[in-house]
Swiss-Prot record:
Annotated protein name in UniProt: 3-isopropylmalate dehydrogenase
Subunit structure: Homodimer.
Catalytic activity, as annotated: (2R,3S)-3-isopropylmalate + NAD(+) = 4-methyl-2-oxopentanoate + CO2 + NADH
UniProt KW keywords: Amino-acid biosynthesis, Branched-chain amino acid biosynthesis, Cytoplasm, Leucine biosynthesis, Magnesium, Manganese, Metal-binding, NAD, Oxidoreductase
One Pfam short name: Iso_dh
InterPro entries (alphabetical): ICDH/IPMDH, IsoCit/isopropylmalate_DH_CS, IsoPropMal-DH-like_dom, LeuB_actb
Site (Important for catalysis): 131, 181
Coiled-coil region: none
Organism: Mycobacterium ulcerans (strain Agy99)
Cofactor binding remark: Binds 1 Mg(2+) or Mn(2+) ion per subunit.
Length: 339
């Protein structure tokens, strides 16, 4: 396996170091290449993501990312120049966000005994919607200013995400929920709903449901156990995945995969939390989400048994840690010891 590592900014290098520690335990011999991308490189060279680096990244099997963002860089510069560019250049049309409440982890929800287990995954479209930069503004700064952000949805883009979601549902509990707002967003909503129905005919064993996005947020709080696989567009997915993380114990336990399902490009895996510059360098950042990202990476590369080993070790750690606050390295050491 050839792995590109982008530790990034803030706590990124600290949590990635622990994720790599776990990877070395379960999958020795990985060929690793570190890339200095983020605020430090931007300040030193003015570069964000050179074309030459993109070409090098394409030669790897996967990418492990820490975190990007620093208050010394204007907002949006690194996010658009690095993260969004990677998303479009490497065709990350699927953003995968598991949502599971692990034993021993507290949820802010008042869950009743006997409620269904919270264990779902959100398959979010990653390259379309209103994030394509298709829009503009006129008469800026005047009382007559007009601004638009056009949401782009293509049959090609929707179909490939929906098919991936059905495939995941077949490997899980065989239930898929489309989340959209087709009573108001009638054109895009119709495309999504017709596509789900059409492709769903190829998966008769998968039970299909639909929820408006506002109803889905209610049910994610009142009855999250109803969900198995959720498929949705870029914007709605961006919103409900953060709610899902909160329901499952916080964004510090949320891992994600940015996936090119065609496997033409290396997919990228990362913890969802930000760079947290206020605690960077103190050795107190929780690396659990970064370690969970390694599990997603391994599963994507077909190493399911190895990924399951990491999952079980993380589950065991979370079940026993209680209110204990461990240093970053200590978390990695404890999970590594369990392996």
């Amino acid at each position: 396996m050839k792995l590109a590592i982008v530790a990034g900014d803030g706590i990124g290098p600290e949590v990635v170091a622990q994720a790599v520690k776990i990877l070395d335990v379960v999958q020795p011999g990985v060929e690793k290449t570190n890339y200095d991308l983020g605020a430090r490189r931007f300040h030193a060279t003015g570069e964000i993501l050179p074309d030459s680096v993109i070409a090098e990244l394409r030669e790897h099997d996967a990418i492990l990312l820490g975190a990007i963002g620093d208050p010394s860089v204007p907002s949006g510069v690194l996010e658009r120049g690095l993260l969004l560019r990677l998303r479009f250049e490497l065709d990350y049309h699927i953003n995968l966000r598991p949502g599971r409440l692990y034993p021993g982890v507290k949820s802010p929800l008042a869950l009743e005994p006997g409620n269904p287990e919270i264990d779902f995954v959100v398959v979010r479209e990653g390259t379309e919607g209103p994030y394509t930069g298709n829009g503009g503004a006129i008469r800026v700064g005047t009382a007559n200013e007009v601004a638009t952000e056009v949401s782009v949805n293509t049959a090609f883009g929707v179909r490939r995400v929906v098919r991936d979601a059905f495939e995941r549902a077949m490997r899980r509990r065989k239930h898929l929920t489309l989340v959209h707002k087709n009573n108001v967003l009638t054109f895009a909503g119709s495309l999504w709903w017709r596509t789900v129905q059409e492709i769903g005919e190829e998966y008769p064993d998968v039970e299909l449901a639909y929820q408006h996005v506002d109803a889905a947020t209610i049910h994610m709080v009142t009855d999250p156990g109803r969900f198995d696989v959720i498929v949705t567009d870029n914007l709605f997915g961006d919103i409900i995945t953060d709610l899902a993380a909160a329901v499952c114990g916080g964004i510090g336990l949320a891992a994600s995969g940015n996936i090119d399902a065609t496997r033409t490009n290396p997919s990228m895996f990362e913890p969802v939390h930000g760079s947290a510059p206020d605690i960077a360098g103190q050795g107190i950042a929780d690396p659990t989400a970064a370690i969970m990202s390694v599990s997603l990476l391994l599963a994507h590369l077909g190493l399911d048994d190895t990924a399951s080993r990491v999952d079980r070790a993380v589950e065991g750690y979370l079940a026993t840690r209680g209110n204990e606050r461990l240093a970053t390295a200590a978390v990695g050491e404890r999970i590594a010891a369990a392996l």
